[in-house]
Amino acid sequence: LILFTKNVIVFLVIIMKLKSWMSKIDGKNEVLRLNIPGTHDCVTQFVQFSHISKCQNMNIYEQLYLGVRALDIRVESRGDRLKMVHGIAKAFNTKNHFSKQMDMADVLAHCYRFLDENPSETIVFQFKNDSAKEMERCFDLMLNNYINKNPEKWYMDNRSPYLDEARGKIIFIRRCKMDTTKGYDIGKTGIDFSNWVEQTTAVPQPLVLNTSGENEIKFIIQDRFKYKPEPRWNECIKPFLDSMNKWDGKYIINYLSTAGGLKGPYNNSKYINPKFLSYKLNKDYYYGTIYMDFPTKELTTKIIETNF
């Protein structure tokens, strides 16, 4: 006999809504003008050197089911395959680190399954080579060995799509260079984030990123990950949130994660996430895509609700 208390019923209703929250959004809205929950280093549920490398406690499918719609993907090339990493730390599908390293195909299996079950949704897929070598080759491998096997699942234009254009698809953001000798069409290789500048210094200001191509758009990015958690919140995250207002033509990306100090991402998130949870968001304001470590249903719901 299973007894459903009021709290359990409320929890189940919230989860059901989170997995398909975009179904309630008018398809004429631009995806990147929505307030979107995202996960930083989303593949790190099972990862080497977990104290400093683990940023998530759920797999990709579970994150998407929780309402996450933006994934921060880090890869390295191994032969003709792309493997999942966080810096030098390898990511795996299970706790067994002697098993095979997680492949891009494993990540996409989660994404495709979720979109097949929830065709009203879309996934923003920020792709980065984290190995500091073979930068252009990683995009070649991604395009030819993964994307082109299921092209109908991908939105590859170099512009911000409307939701109706992207439902049931993955929006590719290319945060790496590509081989210009291959004759790729810049307009069909994803939203171009190849000019991304790593925010490696402890300076509180966000940075501007302009995409290339005929549909150039401007992003304001806050990712000052070198701070310890308390100054990270007080000097970077909160002032950036305080500066938000209604949409003004610039797209926003805001990272709540930090690698500063010796406590590691999990302990850092235990300080920052409650601060964000108690911060009042204005439903009329544009906050952009917010990437988090160890999100909860309360955190994703907080962001999602500002769209309604």
Predicted regions and their residues:
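Surface-exposed substrate-engagement region within the catalytic domains
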Residues: 148-284
